[in-house]
A protein has these predicted regions:
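Hydrophobic alpha-helix immediately C-terminal to the catalytic Tyr-X-X-X-Lys motif of short-chain
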Residues: 151, 155, 159, 189, ...
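C-terminal substrate-binding subdomain of Rossmann-fold SDR/epimerase-dehydratase oxidoreductases
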Residues: 58, 197-314
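A conserved pocket-lining segment of Rossmann-fold NAD(P)-dependent short-chain dehydrogenase/reductase
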Residues: 86, 136, 166-167, 171-181, ...
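Short beta-loop-alpha junction of Rossmann-like oxidoreductase domains
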Residues: 127-129, 178-180, 283
Length: 314
């Protein structure tokens, strides 16, 4: 992608900041983010770039029409991205993730945007009995967060069918990488485990640790966003690596890389959590998505990032 004018909602977030960084290499980027879950620190190295514009407000509060006018594409990542947080406060999740998405779609339709790329989630599948998740399977949301993402997908489909707005929905599977926040009470498992084991703290595992995830390095997600935007494809696509890692294996890998032998603490499973998550990613091959990488090598890069961050803070 080159010489385009694009919007990234949630562009200060973990995934959004990586996408913003890549897009800025050849495009004009407007980031909309109120730092509800993102951080300006994630893009501080980009702030001097003359092709970057920042709108430091919530998509819920803004009139998006003026901002979207003259823009080519909208990458919609802004959300409250947490299953347990949605269980605790479903109303806030619905407002940010459903109302926010509807506002984005309306403004995109009215402003002549060429395509909306919507960040969805593998959580929409829930605990469907078939292990390998395919896009044509019925969704079975197990949490308010998953419901908001399934609803966002349906809004995207309806806006394409009724109004002719091209949309594509990317179902991310357990994304990890640098800049992921380990400190929130709703933090994802990989940054939480890395920082805990670095500090000789026992990782807390919900359940027996044999639940598995299709962990996806953030750079693959960035590539998927750009490829899907440039293509003529629309609809729903899984974005993952189609590899199955258990939580117990994850802890073992982190211990091995850090040269530690920290024992886990196992407690009861959480409401809304699912047992297994593994993607069939063949459909995303239609727009050229073909992730290549070794999980342990990617994990080493993330651990190195956290070690550098800790050393620089001293």
């Amino acid at each position: 992608m080159k010489d385009k004018k694009v919007i990234v909602t949630g562009g200060m977030g973990f995934i959004g900041s990586h996408l913003t960084e890549k897009l800025l290499e050849n495009n004009e980027v407007t980031v909309i983010d109120n730092e509800a879950t993102g951080k300006i620190d994630n893009i501080k190295h980009l702030l001097e770039n003359k092709n970057l514009t920042i709108v430091h407000e919530s998509i819920i509060e803004l009139d998006l029409h003026e901002i979207f006018k003259g823009k080519d594409y909208v990458f919609h990542l802004a959300a409250i991205p947490s299953v347990p947080r949605s269980v605790k406060d479903p109303f806030a999740s619905n407002e940010a993730n459903v109302t926010g998405t509807l506002k984005v779609l309306i403004a995109a339709k009215d402003s002549g945007v060429k395509k909306v790329i919507f960040s969805s989630s593998s959580s929409v599948y829930g605990d469907t009995p078939t292990l390998l998740k395919r896009e044509d399977m019925p969704v079975n949301p197990q949490s308010p967060y998953a419901i908001t993402k399934a609803t966002g997908e349906m809004y995207c489909r309806v806006f394409q069918e009724l109004y002719g707005l091209p949309t594509i929905c990317l179902r991310y599977f357990n994304v990890f990488g640098p800049r992921q926040d380990p400190n929130s009470q709703y933090a994802a498992v990989i940054p939480k485990f890395i920082t805990g084991i670095m500090n000789d703290e026992s990782p807390v595992i919900y359940g027996d640790g044999e639940q598995s995830r299709d962990f996806t390095y953030v750079k693959h997600v960035v590539v998927a966003n750009i490829l899907s935007c440039e293509s003529n494809e629309t609809g729903i696509f899984n974005i993952a690596c189609s590899r199955r890692i258990t939580i117990n294996e994850l802890v073992a890998y982190i211990n091995e890389i850090l040269g530690k032998d920290i024992i886990t603490e196992n407690i009861d499973s959480r409401p809304g959590d699912i047992k297994h998550s593994l993607a069939d990613i063949s459909r995303a091959g239609k727009f050229g998505y073909n992730p290549v990488g070794d999980f342990r090598d990617e994990l080493k890069k993330v651990i190195q990032w956290f070690e550098n961050k800790r050393n620089n803070a001293v």
